[in-house]
Amino acid sequence: MFEAKLKSRSQPKLGALAVTFPIPEERYENVILALQNLQIGDVRKQDCCIESIRAPDCPALNRMTGTMANADELDWLGKQLESFDRYELLQFNAAVERFGLSAADELIDLSFCAREVTVVSDFNDLELVGKRHYLIVHGACDPKELENLDGKETALALISGQPGYVTRYGVVYDNGMKLEQAYDRKHLPPIWMAENCILELKIRVTGEDDPKKQEWVQLPTSQIKLERAMLRAGIASCGEMQMLVSDSRFPDAVDCALDVEHGSLFELNQLCRACSNFKKQDFVKLGAVCQMAKPTCAANIRQLAENLDQFDFAPNVHTPEELGKYMIQQSGHYEYDENLEEFYNYGDYGVKRILQDDGVFVDRGYVCYHGTLTLDELMRDDPAESYQQEQEAKMEGMTW
């Protein structure tokens, strides 16, 4: 979305670092460490001096040049703007100039309401201007209602009815929009759920009731990003943290087994990383496997996810006859001949497979396990590894 050159205002001789925002997930940790080498990148302070900006799709961001910002604020802003379409970027650019904003925290606030303004950059097509303005003001409408709308008349009413502010991006009409503080300068606001996100959580100090004093984390992510979110939320250690699910791409059977309230944030992150390349059918299969194996925590489910190929799954199969039919016609284990259809005894073969596989029917179909370990052994996590994770997650004395 944009590139910013960041440096320390008090130690400019240390040099500057060019950072692309939003920071690619796989580069986040290295970027933070590189910023720390320049004595910037603090989790809470606005200690990054923006030396220059390159933002071809959002030139209004150049107004941040020379200002101070927090690295995670810039990362959040880059991610938010990445979700904007072409006209929404036009609205944002024009609104930045209209309201004379330049600081990253101000632009975060604006990103929540910039879509409320109407920007007219071409007065030659008043029909389009009017219909677009109508959609902005009303949010949505029936397609027939929009088709029957006199766009030109609506545009003329807009132009004559409220003052317009000329910017290099077009004429801005506020539509009564008020710029309000959505970001409290401590806790980053929630943001759209990324495509690669599997689980979104709200984290806060146990017993904290103020909804503003919490952080949103999207898993999987880097450990350092989780630790920084904990610090922003004032969470000193995992034992002082309360987690709530905000959104999930896991099937219900997995969500029910997670026990997020008493689980480990870092185990949940490991689970999501294990599922990062899953397709829709893999998630469905994992849900069926969870119903069969009955895991009790994220570590158990991660072991199942990492060993999913040791399970066979027949979706939407709930009777021995359906199982027999699936195995013969769809599993690929046999050459099915439709001319012999009347000779197949699907029910008997289904019963035989169930007894042979020790399989079970669950909500989403039939599942069986063919590994060499018992299910309990398969799900058993390495206790030494879990202990190390918890030790690394202790935040006391951590410096950024």
Predicted regions mapped to residue ranges:
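N-terminal ordered "arm"
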Residues: 1-45, 195-235
